[in-house]
């Protein structure tokens, strides 16, 4: 799970950020605009460490803290860039993820065009899209220190 995957497009952005306009960078994550935006604003927040999918997250303080930090970064970006919009945050779950590198979708709604909302629906037990807050509840450590 740790480190960088040489074949991963998001790991390439982490290694060589000059190819992408970064909206945020810190020791844990980077953020940039989705190349195929589905909303008025559509940003991605990714960990610098290669974590393939939400299924690789566990009820551990470090995983919970990472996702909470990703959400905080996304919220700050959208509050700054689209404060009047409704915001939505979440992750695709396998097999519906397009890139095998954990990434938080951050939306300032509405979806553009409107039909793109279909891509970001929960499919219940089949997976689909999971809201960031729902994922946080799912991975919250049982004896949380955070």
Swiss-Prot record:
- Cysteine-cysteine disulfides: none
State the Gene Ontology terms under molecular function: adenylylsulfatase activity; nucleotide binding; sulfate adenylyltransferase (ADP) activity
UniProt EC number = 2.7.7.5, 3.6.2.1
What positions does UniProt annotate as the active site of this protein? 105
Q: Name one Pfam family in it.
A: DcpS_C
Tell me one GO biological process term. Answer: sulfur compound metabolic process
Provide the primary localization.
other
Tell me where the signal peptide lies. Answer: none
Q: Which UniProt keywords apply?
A: Hydrolase, Nucleotide-binding, Nucleotidyltransferase, Peroxisome, Transferase
Catalysis performed (reactions): sulfate + ADP + H(+) = adenosine 5'-phosphosulfate + phosphate; adenosine 5'-phosphosulfate + H2O = sulfate + AMP + 2 H(+)
Motif (Histidine triad motif) positions are 101-105
Q: Which GO terms describe its cellular component?
A: cytosol; peroxisome
Query: What switches its activity on or off, per the activity regulation note?
Result: The adenosine 5'-phosphosulfate phosphorylase activity is enhanced at low pH.
Q: How does it assemble?
A: Homodimer.
Q: What does this protein do?
A: Possesses adenylylsulfatase activity in vitro, releasing AMP and sulfate from adenylyl sulfate. Also possesses adenosine 5'-phosphosulfate (APS) phosphorylase activity in vitro. Catalyzes the phosphorolysis of APS, leading to ADP and sulfate.
Entry protein name: Bifunctional adenosine 5'-phosphosulfate phosphorylase/adenylylsulfatase HINT4
- Gene coding for it: HINT4
């Amino acid at each position: 799970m740790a480190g960088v995957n040489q074949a991963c497009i998001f790991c390439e952005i982490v290694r060589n950020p000059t190819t992408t306009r970064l909206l945020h960078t810190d020791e844990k994550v980077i953020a940039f605009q989705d190349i195929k935006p589905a909303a008025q604003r559509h940003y991605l927040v990714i960990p610098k460490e290669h974590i393939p999918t939400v299924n690789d997250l566990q009820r551990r303080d470090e995983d919970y803290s990472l996702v909470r930090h990703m959400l905080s970064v996304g919220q700050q970006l959208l509050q700054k860039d689209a404060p009047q919009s409704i915001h939505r945050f979440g992750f695709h779950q396998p097999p519906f993820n397009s890139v095998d590198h954990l990434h938080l979708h951050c939306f300032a709604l509405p979806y553009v065009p409107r039909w793109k909302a279909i891509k970001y629906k929960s499919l219940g037990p089949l997976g689909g899209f999971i809201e960031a807050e729902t994922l946080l509840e799912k991975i919250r450590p049982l004896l949380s220190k955070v």
